[in-house]
Amino acid sequence: MRGIETPIKTLRQKVFTEVAKVAFDSQNINDDIEAIPYKITPGDAPLYRESIYRERAICSERVRLAMGLSLRPDDEPVHVTSGLDESNVAEKYYEPPLMQVIPSACDMCEDNVYEVSNQCRGCVAH
């Protein structure tokens, strides 16, 4: 929906802006990338979720996806910048799938359903 300003669109723009700033201006890329979630969600009061930690975890996944990396596994600890060196090449094709659902952001709506209705459980965009 072009022209309609939503919180999800604003967050997406902030993530891409911060990733671009780090790519062009950073001297220490790994530390600056790890700090992006704290820049986008400052303070200790959550805006969209019940916990600031969950918001930052979701933002970390958005940062990875914005850099062309895949989502981190849920069952093991992995840094936001893990795999960045292998991904930092002149030409890189995306890693399938093209669209991904961030598991920590999902409120467990039914899988494989393409219709969004008033039965949604309150994602940021609704």
Q: Where on the chain are the PLM-derived regions?
A:
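Ferredoxin-type iron-sulfur electron-transfer modules and their immediate structural context
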Residues: R2-H126
